[in-house]
């Protein structure tokens, strides 16, 4: 059962060099130490958090969802699915590595070498593509830390695999170019996610032979289920977030270490704020570290996928592969990928049009797009990924004015694709695949001062007609003084009636995909 921590008796100030720490304790919770600052690790305290302006303005972040699971190039969740008897990943592992009772995920980790990884060159590409923040994988469900981890000394990127501080090198490359820097953590799900590694085949020559996750010599990677119910490994549901207190404390210490070493501007968690007191303490620590760095101002962002976590202060909502159904009152974020989260060979990627349409649609609803370009184990983007990145670069060079530092207008758009976002089991995430393709009849709006940017989601035949910008439309925009098209140097022929704004298209398109009409109000 989750318990909400009360303020009463929670805080006592202690001194420790070089940091001042808040020590907070409960009878049922180990002592959790966090940076001294404006926040305690309680929901009541975190209500006063406000999302910083940089996140409101940034609109586009790029992400390297990258680690040892990228090395086989088989896509998502390889570290778990290779232990699912009969699955495609299990069969692939048998063919290329051997049986998981002998050769398991521990033997995949050394094949993650990052031998072609050039973080400086990649960051140049990301900056040109228009990213204002960059997010590095910190640790995935596979329990492998991508930094020089104090609390996971054997299974981290400095001690094994590439033998480099991946997070630190990404951080340096990003901040050198003026980007905000984020890290993602998926660790809270790891304890029961790895249950499959503790099983065995049910049939065949290896029936009943335990997989290598049962070997206590590797419990620091696969976890120890000692003290758990006898059938835990068989019954555990992936990402059920079932874990003993010892694991929750391990989680707290590791992510706190990540924050302390790399001071991210953004910390993303793959789910809700985990483990109540432990997770809330991490959020508070993250914000307090930021306050120390910025003269008392909290410039940090924490992403949770649980709407209730973000209902009043606390953090910024993130929707995985999804979108909200209206203009959200606070800045939020979609995280998605052009393919699989982990690199998969020969997969079909999102087209540049889909990426551009998503960006304009999300920004019109007060959101940011965090887009993953998955790296293979070598660390080099493939040619098809580079083509998508190049197309995004060209589009943002023309249309970035209507994206960055804008705010939503009175409505996010108009056109045939204005139906509410379909929910998945009552949740707004994971709905991107069920959304209709946007057409030239669809329009998305952003605004900045007395300017309204109308993104027409394709090249219309002859004329763009925008009903919401009619002088007497329901939105009451007022009189339009001038209309321009971003990327087009000539004057446009246009007219505003009571019912619409009509704009004649010039002979040539200024860019591919969506075009931006810039309407200046009187």
For each feature predicted by the language model, list its residue ranges.
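A general, composition-driven signal for non-globular sequence regions
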Residues: 1-2, 17-20, 50-53, 59
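N-terminal export signals
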Residues: 2-3, 7-28
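Mature catalytic domains of secreted/periplasmic carbohydrate-active enzymes
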Residues: 28-522
């Amino acid at each position: 059962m989750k318990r909400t921590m009360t303020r009463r008796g929670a805080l006592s100030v202690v001194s420790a060099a070089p940091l001042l720490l808040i020590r907070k304790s409960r009878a049922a919770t180990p002592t959790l130490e966090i940076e001294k600052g404006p926040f305690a690790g309680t929901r009541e305290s975190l209500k006063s958090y406000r999302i910083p302006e940089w996140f409101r303005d940034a609109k586009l972040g790029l992400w390297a969802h990258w680690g040892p699971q990228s090395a086989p190039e088989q896509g998502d969740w390889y570290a778990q699915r290779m232990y699912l008897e009969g699955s495609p990943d299990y069969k692939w592992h048998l063919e290329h590595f051997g049986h998981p009772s002998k050769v398991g995920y521990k033997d995949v980790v050394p094949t993650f070498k990052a031998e072609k990884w050039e973080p400086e060159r990649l960051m140049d590409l990301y900056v040109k593509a228009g990213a204002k923040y960059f997010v590095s994988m910190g640790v995935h469900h596979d329990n492998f830390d991508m930094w020089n981890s104090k609390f996971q000394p054997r299974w981290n990127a400095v001690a094994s695999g590439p033998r480099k501080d991946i997070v630190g090198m990404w951080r340096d490359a990003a901040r050198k170019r003026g980007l905000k820097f984020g890290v993602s953590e998926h660790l809270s799900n790891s304890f029961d996610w790895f249950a499959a590694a503790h099983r065995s085949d049910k049939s065949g020559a290896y029936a009943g032979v335990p997989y290598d996750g049962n070997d206590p010599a590797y419990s620091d990677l696969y976890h120890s289920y000692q003290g758990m119910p006898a059938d835990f490994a068989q019954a555990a549901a992936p990402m059920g977030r079932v874990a003993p207190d010892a694991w929750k404390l391990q989680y707290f210490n590791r992510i706190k270490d990540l924050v302390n070493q790399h001071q991210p501007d953004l910390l993303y968690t793959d789910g809700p704020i985990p483990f109540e007191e432990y997770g809330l303490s991490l959020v508070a620590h993250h914000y307090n570290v930021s306050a120390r760095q910025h003269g008392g101002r909290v410039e940090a962002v924490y992403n949770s996928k649980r709407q209730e976590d973000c209902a009043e202060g606390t953090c910024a909502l993130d929707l995985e592969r999804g979108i909200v159904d209206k203009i959200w009152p606070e800045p939020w974020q979609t995280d998605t990928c052009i393919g699989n989260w982990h690199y998969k060979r020969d997969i079909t990627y999102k087209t540049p049009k889909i990426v551009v349409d998503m960006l304009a649609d999300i920004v019109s609803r007060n959101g940011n797009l965090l887009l993953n370009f998955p790296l293979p184990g070598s660390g080099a983007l493939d040619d098809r990924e580079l083509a998508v990145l190049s197309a995004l670069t060209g589009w943002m060079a023309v249309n970035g004015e209507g994206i960055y530092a804008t705010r939503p207008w009175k409505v996010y758009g108009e056109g045939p694709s204005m139906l509410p976002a379909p929910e998945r089991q009552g949740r707004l995430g994971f709905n991107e695949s069920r959304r209709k393709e946007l057409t030239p009849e669809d329009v998305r709006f952003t605004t900045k001062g007395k300017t309204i940017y109308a993104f027409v989601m394709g090249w219309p035949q002859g004329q763009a007609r925008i009903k919401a910008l009619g002088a007497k439309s329901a939105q009451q925009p007022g009189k339009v003084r001038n209309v321009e098209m971003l990327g087009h140097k000539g004057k446009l022929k246009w007219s505003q009636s009571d019912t619409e704004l009509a704009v004649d298209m010039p002979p040539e398109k200024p860019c591919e995909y969506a075009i931006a009409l810039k309407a200046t109000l009187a």
